[in-house]
């Protein structure tokens, strides 16, 4: 065992009797803390804390964070915590700064915890080594796990090594990563991946690959349904929609893989699944941009924004109720059964003329074609180009990105990473251009959809929204002016060569 601060685990309970009374010439002192307390294991749905090698626990009114280094830090948190950004300033908030502000914490396991501290004392009663033990018993599954955090006290390496060896002799193992805690304390533990890697075999056909991609993202969409219904955070609906959008891209871009009739049926089917989610997502985006909107306008116009966001919040509540009802409806259940029969049953989609093409051959052809289309549109854009063509460039870039990601495992990881990175830079500018455009249209519709009488509230809303539209328009123009420069950067000789090498046949 390593002679430094380290976390260990043991499958089962550990009592003070198992330690005995001494280690060599040093006395073992057992300090039992208060009676058992309730614990909660916290993480976001995307398990960003686990993926960082950490474990976040709530014991009574204290947050405890186990770091990959073996260090343990704590922070008082008297109230239940949803978002890390809402936590008061302190060591845990700082350590978890990587957690997305859009992701809410969830209780992924809970139960009771017994705590005790084991200290090694010399004949002068000085502590030479210490271990904090926490025994967790899950309330969901019949399992118990004990974590031991061995604290290295400077100047006493021998005592530390002795206590480390004692833990080893008792059956403790070094906790290399937090997965063991998740596996032991969570019923039906599984790892969520919003962008799962899809392995494509050397002999796989275009048809096999299309079906595999659709099956994969269907599972991602279905994994997010409960979070949409429970309204845990806005990312559940976002990931649900992105998954369906990727499926629709497969159906649209994989021409010839499915029969014309089947392709048309699939387009309608997935369009119908997507449609009911649109308005709620729009409202989520507006509410997430709330702070930005207030920053853009002087305080004299903030009252109108307050009124507007109250209306958005009320509409969002109505939209969420409607979508929840839809998710639980017989009609959606019927739609999903139809989809599952096609992609998980014995009656797969009808194949088209290109279905039997080798996946690699098909991939290079469709990616190269999409890349050339992106270049053709972008090279024709200047200051007089209509906005619709700039929007079309954004759509084609997104299609190109999806295609490259779908087939990424067929190509060198480093080369694909370089291509995607250069494409992202262009997409970011196009995305901002689109966001400002969409927001202007939405705000105009918001005003036009209401017959505003000359009340104080309606006048304030009209003034604020009018000013906001003007500012967003200016920002859109700025981003539009960057598009040509960003494309020139994307369309450099190195990127052209990379695309030709990877995809031109």
Indicate residue ranges for each PLM-predicted region.
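Function-determining surface determinants
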Residues: 1-505
């Amino acid at each position: 065992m390593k002679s430094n601060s380290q976390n260990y685990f043991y499958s089962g309970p550990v009592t003070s009797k198992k330690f005995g009374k001494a280690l060599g010439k040093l006395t073992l002192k057992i300090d039992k803390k208060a009676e058992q307390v309730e614990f909660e294991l916290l993480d976001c749905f995307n398990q960003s804390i686990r993926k960082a090698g950490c474990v976040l626990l709530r014991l009574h009114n204290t947050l405890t964070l186990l770091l990959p280094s073996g260090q343990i830090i704590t922070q008082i948190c008297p109230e239940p915590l949803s978002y890390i950004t809402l936590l008061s300033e302190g060591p845990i908030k700082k350590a978890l700064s990587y957690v997305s502000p859009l992701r809410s914490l969830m209780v992924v396991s809970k139960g009771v915890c017994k705590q005790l501290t084991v200290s090694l004392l010399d004949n002068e009663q000085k502590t030479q080594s210490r271990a904090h033990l926490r025994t967790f018993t899950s309330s969901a599954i019949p399992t118990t796990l004990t974590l031991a955090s061995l604290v290295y006290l400077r100047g006493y390496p021998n005592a530390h090594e002795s206590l480390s060896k004692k833990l080893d002799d008792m059956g403790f193992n070094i906790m290399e990563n937090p997965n063991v805690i998740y596996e032991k304390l969570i019923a039906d533990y599984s790892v969520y991946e919003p962008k799962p890697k899809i392995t494509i075999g050397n002999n796989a056909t275009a048809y096999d690959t299309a079906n595999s991609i659709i099956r994969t993202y269907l599972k991602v969409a279905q994994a997010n349904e409960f979070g949409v219904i429970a309204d845990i955070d806005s990312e559940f609906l976002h990931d649900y929609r992105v998954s369906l959008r990727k499926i629709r891209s497969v159906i649209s871009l994989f021409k010839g893989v499915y029969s014309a009739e089947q392709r048309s049926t699939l387009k309608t089917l997935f369009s119908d699944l997507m449609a009911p989610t649109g308005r709620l997502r729009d409202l989520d985006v507006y509410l997430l941009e709330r702070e930005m909107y207030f920053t853009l306008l002087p305080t004299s116009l903030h009252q109108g924004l307050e009124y507007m966001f109250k209306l958005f919040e009320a509409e969002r509540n109505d939209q969420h109720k409607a979508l929840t009802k839809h998710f639980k409806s017989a009609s959606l259940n019927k739609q999903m059964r139809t989809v599952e029969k096609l992609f998980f049953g014995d009656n797969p989609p009808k194949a088209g003329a290109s279905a039997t093409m080798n996946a690699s051959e098909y991939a290079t052809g469709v990616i190269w074609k999409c890349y050339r289309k992106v270049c053709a549109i972008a090279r024709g854009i200047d200051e007089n180009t209509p906005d619709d063509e700039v929007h079309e460039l954004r759509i084609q870039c997104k299609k190109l990105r999806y295609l490259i990601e779908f087939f990424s495992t067929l190509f060198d990881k480093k080369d694909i990473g370089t291509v995607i990175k250069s494409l992202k830079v262009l997409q970011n500018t196009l995305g901002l251009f689109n966001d400002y455009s969409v927001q202007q249209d939405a705000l105009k519709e918001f005003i036009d959809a209401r017959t505003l009488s000359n009340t104080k509230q309606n006048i304030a809303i009209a003034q604020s929204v009018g000013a906001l539209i003007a500012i967003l328009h200016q920002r859109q123009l700025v981003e539009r002016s960057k598009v040509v420069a960003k494309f020139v950067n994307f369309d450099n000789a190195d990127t052209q060569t990379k695309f030709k090498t990877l995809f031109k046949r």
